[in-house]
Amino acid sequence: MKQQFAAKHPWTILAAGAAIQVLTGLPAAWGVFQQPVMEEYGLSEQGAGYAFALLIASFGVGCVLGGFLQDKKGPRCAALWGTALLCGGFFAAAFLPGWAGWGFFLAFSIPAGLGTAFLYPSIQSCAQKWYAGRKGLATGVIGGAVGLSGAFLTLFVRAALRGFG
């Protein structure tokens, strides 16, 4: 059934992969998160900078780990772990008390960095495999989604902060 859908609607599958890749651009949208994080957790600009640095470092390490996990267990496993880590980072940060600013590093930066990194190679390699005849286009669509994600997430988060505080 899944194979039939993919065969009949290949561009829908690629669009879904691109939509998922928008989430991997979370580090590119850090600027919109920085001020609310500083206010909520009592972090200085330097402390928020450390949170961002840890997010980026976790992303870098996570790309290697996510690629390894994908080779061993497949892209579905890597994507599920990535989704769980990313969502877990947001949920943990949401329930973290405001006085525990240092906890933000552990609760959000590490799991969100790893989660976005686990998603990145799984979607990219699947696009290249499924669109073997159009690897360049498939890679371009997925890469373009990552590039546009910083702008999209920035606009989305700003609207959400205005609407929900």
Name each model-derived stretch.
Residues 7-29:
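Pair of pore-lining "gating" transmembrane helices in MFS-fold secondary transporters
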Residues 84-98:
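C-terminal ends and interior cores of transmembrane alpha-helices
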Residues 10, 95-106:
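Helix-loop junctions at membrane interfaces in 12-TM secondary transporters
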Residues 28, 56-64, 151:
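Residue-level signature of mid-helix packing/kink "hotspots" within the transmembrane helices
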Residues 22, 89, 101-118:
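Hydrophobic core of transmembrane alpha-helices in multi-pass small-molecule transporters
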Residues 37, 116-131, 138:
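Intracellular juxtamembrane helix-capping segments at the cytosolic ends
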Residues 62-75:
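Helix-to-loop junctions at the C-terminal end of transmembrane segments
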Residues 145-165:
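Helix-loop-helix hairpin linking two adjacent transmembrane segments in secondary transporters
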